[in-house]
Design a protein with these regions (language model features):
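Peripheral, non-catalytic segments flanking oxidoreductase cores
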Residues: 1-386
Length: 386
């Protein structure tokens, strides 16, 4: 399928990264990021042979004995590792997952728990070579390919907005390329038979693979199974989600990856880019896999609305600056335990009364981003209700 074939209002756009017409490519990216906030990307330069090896390696990981995976369990002191109990919007997801992030040392060859690898998100926890042969090497290789593609896409997004080289917002992209705090999530969705009362509560709504949410970071690169039709994107805003036609299913193109913009891109673009609400459905008979790569800023980065966008020079500033490390810590804490109110970009809107601005200043003063974060230690800051 070529990028100009997707004209249906019920399909997210398809963009060909190999398009030699730079202006056309930028216009396609701009339209996708400002309308859907989602697009499928073809000819993205991640080798298809690597994608296939990564799919096979991922399946081997989740087929390991449960007790082996539990040895890698994440906790309140370490955001990275295996888990099967995540909360999304305060509701438990129907999935198993493993989070792997860029090491604090930026050196994958260092041992996982080497002190140099400490960072806010914690330490990686890989299975041993004996437990899951070649898993580490293949995963790291795929991670680095996603990093390169993310940097390329972020710069294209900036160009689409008319951001010029040398301005503050372009420099943020330079820093992000060097200091990004991205992580790769490996998801496994077991079959979910809603008629099986031993696993599903018949008195509650059918569980979702992942409940409706927006991604917190800058952008996401998602790899799905080619025959998977479970990812759905909200066509409308929250107030309209009660309608049956509120959700549009993403039908994966073989060999493509799916891109979506996140909360930080929305703040950075002053609301020009859309951070879309999306969810994942369960399947009663089929097991499925997916892998989102979350491209995130440095922990110390204050994400603020762009100041040199030729597209909207007179646009009123809509957001206050947002400290990524603070936003990320609160989102992780909310994944792990119910803190009552999940932090959103709406808390940083100029017209919103919120204590998060003061809280993030306090957070930056007391938290060392070169140490793994402890949810319980900083609960007093995290439990802000504003």
């Amino acid at each position: 399928m070529s990028s100009d074939e997707t004209t249906s209002k019920d399909e997210i756009p398809v963009i060909d990264l190999s398009n030699s017409n730079k202006e056309e490519l930028l216009q396609q990216i701009l339209k996708a990021c400002t309308t859907w906030g989602f697009f499928q990307l073809i000819n993205h330069d991640i080798p298809l042979s690597l994608i296939q090896s990564y799919r096979e390696s991922k399946a081997r990981f989740f087929s390991m004995p449960y007790e082996t995976k539990l040895k890698l369990k994440r906790n309140a002191q370490n955001a990275r590792g295996y888990f099967d109990d995540e909360l999304t919007k305060r509701r438990r997801d129907w999935k198993e997952a493993l989070d792997v992030g860029v090491p604090g040392s930026r050196k994958w060859e260092a041992a996982d728990f080497d002190e140099s690898n400490a960072c806010l998100d914690g330490f990686n926890q890989f299975p041993t070579q004996e437990e899951c042969p070649d898993f580490r090497g293949i995963t790291v290789q795929y991670f680095e390919e996603c990093s390169k593609l993310s940097n390329r896409l972020a710069r294209l997004m900036a160009s689409a907005l008319g951001i010029t080289e040398g301005c503050d917002n372009a420099q943020i992209l330079d820093r992000m390329a060097l200091d990004h705090t991205s992580y790769l999530r490996l998801n496994y969705y077991p079959p979910c038979d809603t008629n099986d009362t031993t696993t599903v509560n018949p008195n509650e709504p059918p569980p979702l693979g992942i409940s409706p949410h927006r991604d917190a970071g800058f952008l996401t690169i998602l790899l799905q199974d080619d025959d998977c039709h479970s990812l759905q994107v909200a066509r409308f805003e929250d107030s309209d989600l009660g309608h049956d036609d509120s959700w549009v299913t993403v039908n994966p193109i073989p060999g493509a990856v799916t891109i979506n913009t996140g909360d930080m891109a929305m703040i950075w673009s002053n609301g020009i880019f859309r951070a879309p609400l999306h969810r994942v459905l369960t399947d009663p008979t089929k097991k499925r896999y997916s892998s989102p790569f979350f491209y995130n800023p440095g922990y110390n980065e204050l994400i603020r609305p762009l100041d040199c966008c030729s597209l909207e020079k007179d646009l009123e500033v809509k957001y206050r600056p947002c400290l990524w490390g603070y936003f990320r810590a609160l989102r992780f804490a909310g994944d792990l335990t119910d803190l009552g109110v999940e932090i959103q970009t709406s808390h940083f809107k100029m017209e919103t009364k919120s204590d998060h601005i003061e809280k993030q200043d306090e957070f930056q003063k007391v938290v060392n981003f070169e140490e793994n974060f402890n949810v319980e230690k900083y609960r007093a800051i995290l439990e802000s209700k504003a």
